[in-house]
Amino acid sequence: MEGTSESPVLDEFEVNNNDYDNDFISRFSQNPLNAFSLFTDGNLQEYFMNNSLEKIVIHVVLIVISLCGIKAQTSKIIYVVRLLFWKIYNVINNLVNKVINREKIINHQVVDNRFREFEERFRLLLLQHDKNIAKQDDIVQYNKLDNFAESIKSEFNLKVAEMERRFQELKWRCDMIANKAMNTIVLANTVDSNNKDEKIVFDEGSVVQYNRE
């Protein structure tokens, strides 16, 4: 494929068919030395500010080739130079894309590592919170069991005190019954002893009367 001044060679580097460029090419085609008049007649600073680096390099290449005595068509030279620029552009663009992609990968890895670190810290925080809740639950359960044991102990002490009271009352009643029984037995023995100690006195008159009968 051969580029012409009427059609652009590449999308990235279209031929800028302005008056200045056309004037330069027309003068260069007639006589390469005539191109220097553009630098002398015009402002050199304006030339460098109004033209892209690609165009300036192309102009310089054309002048160098013409001064070296190489007879070549302007369109072919421009096409080759544009291909060279396109290749350089692609290389630089690929390098830039690689650097950008590498930075994206690095940033993605950094973000992923930060996210994993945050996730791990959050998981540890939840575990610590669960442990604290479990400890609090254990303390609550222990307090409940302790209160339950204390209530059973208090109730048991009350039952024991009630049984002791009833035992003392039963003992007192048994002692009363035993004392009454002992008193009754002693009294009965005393009465029997008195009855045995009494003497029987017979009346003589009664005896005589008994004999008569």
UniProtKB/Swiss-Prot annotation:
TM annotation in the entry: 52-74
Alphabetized UniProt keyword annotations: Activation of host autophagy by virus, Enterotoxin, Glycoprotein, Host endoplasmic reticulum, Host membrane, Host-virus interaction, Ion channel, Ion transport, Membrane, Secreted, Signal-anchor, Toxin, Transmembrane, Transmembrane helix, Transport, Viral ion channel, Virulence
HAMAP family: ROTA_NSP4
Protein name: Non-structural glycoprotein 4
PTM notes: The N-glycosyl content is primarily Man(9)GlcNAc, with a small amount of Man(8)GlcNAc.
Role according to the record: Plays an essential role in the virus replication cycle by acting as a viroporin. Creates a pore in the host endoplasmic reticulum and as a consequence releases Ca(2+) in the cytoplasm of infected cell. In turn, high levels of cytoplasmic calcium trigger membrane trafficking and transport of viral ER-associated proteins to viroplasms, sites of viral genome replication and immature particle assembly. The secreted form acts as an enterotoxin that causes phospholipase C-dependent elevation of the intracellular calcium concentration in host intestinal mucosa cells. Increased concentration of intracellular calcium disrupts the cytoskeleton and the tight junctions, raising the paracellular permeability. Potentiates chloride ion secretion through a calcium ion-dependent signaling pathway, inducing age-dependent diarrhea.
GO biological process: monoatomic ion transmembrane transport; symbiont-mediated activation of host autophagy; viral process
Family as reported in the entry's similarity comment: Belongs to the rotavirus NSP4 family.
Species in which this protein is naturally found: Rotavirus X (strain RVX/Human/China/NADRV-J19/1997/GXP[X]) (RV ADRV-N)
Subcellular location: Host rough endoplasmic reticulum membrane; Host membrane, Host caveola; Secreted
Lineage of origin: Viruses, Riboviria, Orthornavirae, Duplornaviricota, Resentoviricetes
GO MF, one example: toxin activity
